[in-house]
Regions:
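Phosphate- and other anionic-substrate recognition elements at nucleic-acid/protein interfaces
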Residues: 1-94
């Protein structure tokens, strides 16, 4: 399985693709939030061998275009709460 982590900010995102046990499939790269670049990203992710799952944090409204384009392309997309991700990373459970 391919695990895609996307760090979303205003106007651009940083994308990294890994497999279990830390195998890097695609080194981190930047994607601008233009229709062409997001569609290119969707194509690049769909071309990967095996199942691909995308996770990104909810960041104001910035994440929405990224999530919608990838979802509309048929990719599994999970938008997560950043506070929950911080708690998990710090091993704090509610």
């Amino acid at each position: 399985m391919n695990e895609v982590g996307i760090d979303v900010s205003k106007g651009k995102s940083m994308v990294c693709v890994m497999r279990p046990f830390g195998e890097v499939v695609l080194e981190p790269f930047e994607v601008l939030h233009t229709a062409q670049n997001l569609n290119d990203l969707a194509g690049k992710l769909k071309a990967l061998d095996g199942e691909t799952r995308v996770v990104l944090e909810a960041t104001g409204n910035y994440h929405k275009a990224v999530a919608f384009v990838l979802h509309d392309a048929g990719l599994f997309v999970s938008v997560v709460n950043p506070v929950l991700m911080l708690a998990i990373s710090m091993d704090i459970y509610f």
